[in-house]
Amino acid sequence: VGSEMCIRDRCKVEHDRLNALPDTVNRQQMLWGINQGATFKDLRIWHMKEIAKLDLPGYAIGGLAVGEPTEVMYEIIEAVEPYMPKDRPRYLMGVGTPSNIIESVARGVDFFDCVMPARNARHAKLFTWQGSINLKNAKYTRDDGPIDPQCVCPVCRRYSRAYLHHLFKAEEMLAMRLSVMHNLYFYNTLTRRIRDSLDTGTFGDFRAEYSQKLAEKI
């Protein structure tokens, strides 16, 4: 072996070198440590301990939500979280459903990314505070109610379930656009309500009320 420095260390050295160059375009870009190890808790913990030594600005848990049971994902988060620096943001990659987000916050995760709001919307699957719905279902043919009676997004204020059902059946592009708008609004509202409940010390109540409910299909 020509060098004892592993790829993990080289990444930080190279990142620091590039940021030190006078013509670097954006010195605000950050290098984060991404925890891996599949569903093996011992490998996950070992890896988290190693990347924590690099003193990076943030840490992520990667390689989950790729087909393993949800409970296994939660077990991995619980195993890794104690070894993540307490003063750095924790990022769970590629997650997830509204229930996944609530349960992961309860386990110490700070933020997320996921295509689910947009991807599901394109297939007529929309999120509401009562659970998820599929607007292609025949029962919405003459449903004049909004997507979600509790939602105040522009779509819910102006359009009915029946109208969006018609748009999907007619294969109109507008159906997907309106549905994506609603789902993104829902996710923004969800995360805002989570933050508010954490600030007021009521997250436990919020979790008890919505974690299971939002996982249901109605």
Question: Model-predicted segments: where are they?
Answer:
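Acidic/glycine-rich phosphate/pyrophosphate-binding loops and surrounding catalytic core
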Residues: C11-L18, W46
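C-terminal extensions of enzymes
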Residues: D148-I218
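Surface-exposed helix-capping loop/turn segments at secondary-structure junctions
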Residues: H15-R27, R88, I194-F206
